[in-house]
UniProtKB/Swiss-Prot annotation:
It is found in: Cytoplasm. It is an enzyme of class 2 (transferase). This is Ribosomal RNA large subunit methyltransferase M. It holds the Pfam family RlmM_FDX. The gene is rlmM. Catalyzes the 2'-O-methylation at nucleotide C2498 in 23S rRNA. It comes from Pseudomonas putida (strain ATCC 700007 / DSM 6899 / JCM 31910 / BCRC 17059 / LMG 24140 / F1). Its main location: cytoplasm.
């Protein structure tokens, strides 16, 4: 129970290690991080009893940037035949669970195990329920079984309210055929990640206005239009005719980094390929000057020192807003649909309600 296991995007194991090591050092939890390149996972092995539990207790999962999912526990080797009996024996000292997720890594090997997990879950669930180890209670801890192979599994536990929203941190979003580009899924995932579902009507309402900077061909604009917003699309490139035909989109041929609205809007979204420091300046202007209430912006990552650069820019934003004496909530996550980038959500907390 003294290892913290984390899923991530393949190639970002080093960023997960850097991030969790920084938090562990700040909290005084001794241990070391390790992650095999392209394995889609990393671990923090605690050298003191209860270290992993303390890390998960002190940290909020939604404040971590690069981990997609986490659980504390340990590895179990399984026989070829009676895997369930071995797992039940291993779970004797665990609490009673309120939910069960079988997970695999986001790798070719992991995908090959998906069919096995689907078939294995039904008899395992029945056995856990019969043994009194699993009940239907969202308030209880979640049992997370990450299969590395058919013979090796990481048996982990996490709070259902302090872990990923979806198994492996991967949302099951369907690409809308009428959307102009697949980038639309990034913004849809961001809504789920950063805004509680019960607040969507209030914060993503059809009486709102939005701006999409660098909008062409309209993947992110599509999400705003889908919510019924009036959208100003800023880009020198063309917009999809299907979006223009809705009557909800005004397309202005302008530079997304210099154009500003005459009146404040509810939402600004931006997915421009640019150096992250320049995009950060754009965020500071829009939120700092009250040009929008909320924003979702992608920061493109450098080739090296990716976590360090993201941390530096987030700290810079926080210091800038503090110096201006304005209250802004800042969240950042590498979403499943992100590639060499992270997605930031910002919200002014000191503006009068609409």
């Amino acid at each position: 129970m003294n290892t913290l296991f984390m899923h991530c995007r393949p190639g970002f194991e080093g960023e997960v290690c850097a991030e969790i090591s920084e938090h562990a050092a700040r909290l005084g939890v001794a241990g070391y991080a390790k992650g095999k390149p392209q394995s889609a996972s990393a671990e923090f092995v605690c050298s003191e009893e209860g270290g992993a539990e303390r890390l998960m207790g002190e940290l909020r999962f939604n404040q971590l940037i690069f981990p997609r999912q986490w659980a504390r526990g340990g590895y179990v080797e399984l026989p070829e035949s009676d895997r369930i009996s071995v797992l039940l024996a291993q779970l004797v000292d665990f609490p009673v669970f309120g939910s069960l997720w079988l997970e695999v890594l986001d790798s070719n090997e992991g995908k090959e195990l998906s069919t096995f997990c689907r078939k294995f879950e039904v008899p395992l669930r029945k056995a856990l329920e019969k043994a009194g180890r699993l009940v239907d209670d969202p308030g209880r801890p979640r049992l997370l079984l990450t299969f590395i192979s058919g013979r090796r599994v990481f048996v982990g536990v996490a709070s259902a309210s302090n872990s990923a929203l979806w198994p492996m941190g991967i949302p099951r979003l369907k690409f809308p055929r009428e959307a102009p580009s697949r980038s639309t899924l990034k913004l849809e995932e961001a809504w789920h990640q950063f805004i509680p579902r019960e607040q969507w009507e209030q914060r993503l309402g059809d009486d709102m206005t939005g701006v999409d900077l660098g909008a062409s061909p309209g993947g992110w604009t599509y999400q705003l239009v889908r919510r019924g917003m009036l959208v100003t699309a800023i880009d020198n490139g063309p917009m999809a005719e299907s979006l223009m035909d809705t009557g909800l989109v005004q397309h202005l041929m302008a530079d997304g980094f210099t154009w500003q609205p005459k009146h404040p809007v509810d939402w600004m979204v931006c997915d421009i390929v640019e150096k992250p420091a320049r995009t950060t300046s754009l965020i500071e202007t829009w939120l700092g000057e009250g040009l929008c209430r909320e924003a979702v912006v992608n920061l493109k990552l450098p080739m090296k020192q990716r976590y360090a650069e993201v941390r530096r820019l987030l700290d810079r934003m926080e210091a800038t807003f503090k110096a201006r004496k304005i209250r802004v909530s800042i969240a950042c996550k590498q979403l499943y649909h992100d590639r060499e980038e992270v997605t930031c959500h910002l919200r002014r907390l000191d503006l009068k309600p609409r």
